[in-house]
Amino acid sequence: RIYMTNTLKLATHPLFTSFVNSTAAGRAGIASAEDRYPFIDYAAKYVDIVVCHQWENGLNYHYYEALHGSYPLVHNSPFLKDVGYYYPDFDIDAAAVAIHDAATNHDDNIEQYKLDAQAALEKVNPFAPKVIDEYRQRLQALMGD
């Protein structure tokens, strides 16, 4: 089953329904438009793979939630291309390869995935000493100290 969360408002839009119905999953009736839900509640019940496609929102907090939970994250965020299962831009063929890779290899590589995810999360952790130090340096440079 494919749950397309945060798409319920699009469910009656002709282009969206045309797109969904053009896919095998849409024709088979296994893709559904869903409301917006707290990620962890929904993921714990329904998610095997998280696919996040963004346009001008490459630091969406859902990426971090998926990484923190060790969910296989298939995404096109250039800011996180070294973690998860990255595909560039709007490249649907590369996205399909990334989804296949996540589905077939994630469990076998989970320990390395967790290490990579933790390293990525540490870069944005507001309590990490390195982040605090960099922020302090930038403030000092801005203030001329």
Named regions from a protein language model:
Residues 20, 45-125:
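Catalytic binding pocket for nucleotide-activated donors in carbohydrate/polymer assembly enzymes
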Residues 23-36:
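Active-site donor-binding acidic/aromatic loop of nucleotide-activated sugar
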Residues 10-11, 39-41, 92-95:
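A short acidic, often aromatic-flanked loop/helix-cap motif at beta-alpha or helix-coil junctions
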Residues 39-40, 63-64, 136:
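Short amphipathic alpha-helical segments and helix-helix/interface helices
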Residues 1, 96, 100, 129-137:
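Well-ordered, non-membrane alpha-helical segments in soluble/globular domains
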Residues 1-25:
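Conserved catalytic-core segment of nucleotide-activated headgroup transferases in glycan assembly
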Residues 35-36, 41-46:
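Short alpha-helical donor nucleotide-sugar binding micro-motif in glycosyltransferases
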